[in-house]
Design a protein with these regions (language model features):
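Short, contiguous, well-ordered secondary-structure segments
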Residues: 1-2, 6-7, 50-52, 56-57
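The first (N-terminal) embedded transmembrane alpha-helix
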Residues: 20-41
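N-terminal juxtamembrane cytosolic/stromal segments of multi-pass membrane proteins
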Residues: 1-22, 27
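Generic detector of bulky aromatic hydrophobic side chains
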Residues: 12, 16, 34, 127-132
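Alpha-helical transmembrane segments of integral membrane proteins
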Residues: 52-222
Length: 222
């Protein structure tokens, strides 16, 4: 049976060096830059929805994951900043730190989805002149898909799980963080599979929706 730690006023307070948070803020800055570039360059893809008020077509399989990535990155920024004490040292002592780290990892996973997924689906439609060229290209496509899948699995599962395992906070707090993480995973899976249905299946004339559970292993849809 899992034994929960009791809150003890004399217990040692969690104190995490502020440099740990700064390193994660650097990752978020890099991720936000990548998101901006991908949103700008999404117009190079063919197809998409033509909506009034937009000069370029909207690709749901690109836009939805990137908007999720942007929102999660901003949430992570807020949580990281809120986790540090407002004193001369700025030591991180609040459970907002690991929660922000989980949001950061999920944001990275959505950035991977917004890049690899749509481009790999476009590559599937490419037809080369000879069978040998097509076979070589197919091997290249599978290699890129494998790299994207590894990156996605690392960000969506490995990173958050390591954060929960290494959490310096009480078992009760860590359990709350775990429940929040699972809830976010389900919400993201449902949203991304819905976007996949809209942008791929409806355009292809297919009416059978993709089960939202496949969004928990998004590389299977690429």
């Amino acid at each position: 049976m899992l034994k929960l730690k009791r809150t003890d006023p004399k217990a040692k307070k969690v104190r995490i060096a502020v440099n740990v948070m700064r390193a994660r803020l650097t990752v978020l800055g890099f991720n936000l830059a990548v998101i901006s570039i991908l949103m700008t360059n999404s117009s190079v893809l063919s197809g998409g929805y033509r909506l009034e008020g937009f000069e370029i077509p909207i690709h749901v399989t690109v836009s939805v994951p990137l908007f999720l990535a942007l929102g999660l990155a901003i949430v992570a920024l807020i949580l990281f900043i809120a986790s540090s004490e407002m004193d001369e040292t700025g030591i991180v002592s609040h459970w907002a730190m690991p929660l922000g780290e989980i949001a950061m990892y999920l944001s990275l996973a959505q950035t991977v989805t917004g890049f690899f997924g749509p481009y790999l689906m476009v590559l599937d439609t490419l037809q080369l002149a000879t069978g040998a060229e097509q076979a070589d290209f197919l091997q290249l496509r599978h290699t890129l898909a494998a790299i994207g899948a590894i990156a996605w699995l690392g960000a969506f599962y490995l990173g958050p799980i390591v954060t929960l395992i290494r959490s310096p906070f009480s078992n009760l707090t860590t359990a709350f963080l775990g429940i929040t993480y699972v809830s976010l995973c389900v919400l993201i899976a449902w949203t991304t599979t819905l976007a996949y249905d809209l942008d791929v299946h409806l355009h292809a004339g297919l009416e059978t929706p993709v089960p939202w559970s496949k969004g928990l292993l998004m590389p299977l849809l690429w």
